[in-house]
Amino acid sequence: MELFSSQQWLALLPPIILCILLFSYVYIILWLRPERLRQKLRSQGVRGPKPSFLFGNIPEMRRIQQLAKSAHEQEAGSTDMFSSNYVATLFPYFLHWSRVYGSIYLYSTGSIQVLNVTDPNMVKELANCKSLDLGKPCYLQKERGALLGMGILTSNGDLWVHQRKVIAPELFMERVKGMVNLMMEAAMSMLNSWKNEVEDRGGSAEIVVDEFLRTFSADVISRACFGSSFSEGKEIFIKIRQLQKAMAKQSMLIGVPGSRYLPTRSNRGIWNLDSSIRTLILNISKKYEHDSSTSVNKDLLHSIIQGSKDGPFASCTPEDFIVDNCKNIYFAGHETTSTTAAWCLMLLASHHEWQSRARVESLDICQGRPLDFDILRKLKKLTMVIQETLRLYPPASFVAREALNDMKLGGIDIPKGTNIWIPIAMAHRDPSVWGPSADKFDPDRFANGIAGACKPPHMYMPFGVGVRTCAGQNLAMVELKVVLSLLLSKFEFKLSPNYVHCPAFRLTIEPGKGVPLIFREL
């Protein structure tokens, strides 16, 4: 007796063919194509951990991280928390693999093949490469699309060139000089609220500074770039912060095809936030266009709106251009600066001699006068403190690039599609570059500038490297100098006993449990 009739076989044939095609697609995308790429690099002596099918090295990364977490918990309290290398707990697999495979090695997260680089010569070539064939990883537009889209942080080719021409001039130092007064206004609003808190509590008060600094930085971005106050864009900042946290939880799933399309609770939350942020930004831009029709005010939002009307939009719409670039500015412009300010205050609170030195310099140079750009330029010790903070706690965790075509770097033929990552925190704490005190807070290392602090100087990269260096670094540095110099002139502060040193990766490296400080008015 036949198990299946011919009609039943015909009915089963389409799903069988579909399964075969699906398996073939998965096999080609997740194994055959990546394996060919890996083989090209292995043939040139590039080594790395053996990947598994479907998930690459993700299972091994999780195993190493769990072991590191257990070891860290056992050692808690036995080491100086300020001299410990948080890379060992946040990215322990990078440390492990670098010890096994050296300063250039290959690993995999699903379909994404990553060449991890800390070799100074290779970093220099990356920094000097001006070819558009070396761009931002394509996965960023897909996996981080809700947060970054195809804005200036993630786009490539002609679209990125256009975005850079539109946005970068608004953040040149000549424009930033004119923003000092509005930075002072935003900072004084925050500091006055702290002053009231200290007075209400009898001369000393514990303040968790993180959210205050986010509000301050968001206020600066709103006023300087979008012609509004923080209150008008508050909902956008809140939702972008929620989106950042949600996407950080998915960081290890990057490269697993289809994971972002699954209707999981996390993905549904991300989709809803993305939709809400898009609506809010478009509403602000429409209101801005209506209001500015009778005004001559020209700021960054004006430039973005104008740029949306004449760009190379084969890969995105004018509305996408506005939304994605505004999201990039909102996120990068306030989150990274506020995080650096929080780390800076933590380090000054735990190193009183440097707090005193920076305060004396600030009071001596300012002499009660309102801040201006010339005064800020003379604050050498404060600049050194900021530079050292950016070294120990860089706002960006990685320099991420992708070979958009076959190319050669560092004597290696890089196949198209290879991602190239520089783990900035590892490079910034490398004893062979920074000396035996690489993990210690020592602003004096920058006394003779970056070139005097490390050899070679291109290994210092808090704002990235090469042509894709952060366009907003001038704004960030001036903003940090303004808020820190004003704060130092009004308060002395120390770490609260409630402070827990717990760096966390949420797309940026930030204080995981906040920075509570005890303030006393001078």
Swiss-Prot record:
The record's annotation in PROSITE patterns points to: CYTOCHROME_P450 (PS00086)
Q: Cite the ranges annotated as topological domain Cytoplasmic.
A: 33-522
**Any idea of its EC number?**
1.14.-.-
The record's annotation in Pfam families points to:
p450
* Keywords recorded for this protein, A-Z: Heme, Iron, Membrane, Metal-binding, Monooxygenase, Oxidoreductase, Signal-anchor, Transmembrane, Transmembrane helix
Q: What family is it from?
A: Belongs to the cytochrome P450 family.
What is this protein's name?
Answer: Cytochrome P450 714C2
